[in-house]
Amino acid sequence: MDGLAIGGVSAPMTAERPQQVKKQLSRRTPDAADGRKPTRMERAKAWTPEIEDQFRLQNSGFKSLDEYVDMYGEPERWPNELGGFISKTQLKSNGYFVYWRKFRECEDKHLAQVKIYYYD
């Protein structure tokens, strides 16, 4: 076993790499898919299926369905006879999957957390 040696370069000891990754993720703006910025925002006051989908998207880090579609494509949904809600999303921050139930998850106590954005 002569002549065999382990060589190489050690990992960098600075925080340079995580900053580069953070910069790549932050290049993406929180605007709508076509670059529009929201002109106003309201909080949800009553539950609807649209509010449910918005709740699921916002818990994954997105402002709107347009923003999600631009990054990952159309989200998977439960069949219409089961409500047609979003069944699986990916997190905006790292791409991990989030699986959602077939029925309502946005309880009344969470309604005020849901933001409805309006674009002109």
Curated annotation (Swiss-Prot):
InterPro entries: Meiosis-expressed_gene_1 (IPR020186). PANTHER family: MEIOSIS EXPRESSED GENE 1 PROTEIN HOMOLOG (PTHR17008:SF1), MEIOSIS-EXPRESSED GENE 1 PROTEIN (PTHR17008). GO terms for cellular component: nucleus. Belongs to the MEIG1 family. This is Meiosis expressed gene 1 protein homolog. Pfam families: Meiosis_expr. Residues 28-45 have a biased composition (Basic and acidic residues). Residues 1-45 are annotated as: Disordered. It comes from the Eukaryota. It comes from Oxyrrhis marina.
